[in-house]
Amino acid sequence: LLRLYALYKQGSEGDVSGEKPGFFDFVGTAKHEAWGKLKGMAGDEAMQKYVDLVKKLRS
């Protein structure tokens, strides 16, 4: 599900921004890192991959 979050953020906001969450914020750190792995991906591409993944998960 982190992949869905990252694709959504990349599609709606673009490349990751802000500081990485603190060491003990495990959820925040995981989200930040997942989003960061998509750096440079176009918003339209991220949105399409999001839709494709949702369709795959629903089937």
Question: Where are the predicted features?
Answer:
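A charge-rich, low-complexity, intrinsically flexible signal that marks solvent-exposed coils, linkers
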Residues: 1-23, 29-59
